[in-house]
């Protein structure tokens, strides 16, 4: 029921035409922006696909995966941009390389090779890029970042998506946007939780600045334990 509702709502957001293509999602894919519109994590939580109309699409996503190392490490890739045409394609899946070690993660961050596979099993023709520090400028949300990117002459720019009105809420206030860059260190965190939820909480806590961590701890102490 929930997944069907999510698919229906998103289909209405992106097009008034009939739904013609399914973007398959895996747990490692963190979908951030689609066709210039922010994707809410709570809206997509638990969904294994996203319904889109046929035609040109641009997605911004990250690869986030708990590596089976000792201790466990949560790998997070730089934000990746890919543009593809879904014409005459019923489904599209993002095919990632094997990322099981820190070395795999570093290699993917440095040279993110992946494919978009159509329902016929063949790779689609795509344009891709990495969202880097110089793309950010003074932008504060992912939607404004992508709007600025799309008016530029970059590998995966789509000018048509630069004019889409921003969502009412396109980013969590106080959240920083990790990006790739020459002077940006690769971030990993050693995690010791017993489940993925606990590991994710640890990871995002470590990503926050000291003031945000303090506010979170104050808030957490006030919450009842269920």
From Swiss-Prot:
Determine the domain of life of the protein's source.
Bacteria
| Keywords assigned | Signal
Extract the signal peptide range.
1-20
Q: Does the keyword Signal apply?
A: yes
InterPro entries given for it?
A: UPF0319 (IPR018635)
Do you know which Pfam families this protein is assigned to? DUF2057 (PF09829)
Answer whether the UniProt record assigns the keyword Signal to this protein: yes
NCBIfam families xref list: PRK03641.1
Q: Give the protein family.
A: Belongs to the UPF0319 family.
- What is the recorded name of this protein? UPF0319 protein YpAngola_A3206
């Amino acid at each position: 029921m929930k997944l069907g509702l999510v698919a229906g709502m998103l289909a209405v957001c992106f097009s008034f035409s009939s739904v013609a293509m399914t973007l398959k999602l895996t747990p490692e894919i963190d979908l951030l922006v689609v066709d210039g519109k922010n994707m809410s994590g709570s809206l997509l939580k638990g969904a294994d696909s996203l319904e889109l109309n046929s035609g040109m699409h641009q997605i911004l996503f990250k690869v986030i995966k708990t590596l089976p190392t000792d201790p466990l490490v949560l790998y997070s890739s730089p934000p990746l941009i890919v543009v593809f045409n879904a014409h005459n394609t019923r489904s599209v899946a993002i095919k990632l390389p094997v990322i099981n070690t820190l070395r795999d993660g570093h290699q993917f961050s440095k040279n993110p090779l992946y494919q978009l596979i159509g329902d016929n099993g063949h790779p689609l023709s795509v344009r891709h890029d990495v969202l880097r520090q110089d793309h950010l400028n003074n932008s504060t949300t992912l939607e404004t970042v992508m709007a600025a990117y799309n008016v530029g002459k970059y590998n995966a720019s789509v000018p048509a998506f630069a004019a889409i009105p921003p969502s009412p809420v396109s980013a969590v206030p106080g959240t920083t946007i990790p990006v790739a860059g020459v002077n940006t260190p690769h971030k990993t965190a050693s995690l010791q939780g017993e489940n993925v939820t606990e590991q994710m909480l640890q990871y995002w806590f470590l990503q926050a600045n000291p003031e945000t961590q303090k506010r979170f701890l104050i808030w957490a102490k006030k919450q009842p334990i269920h």
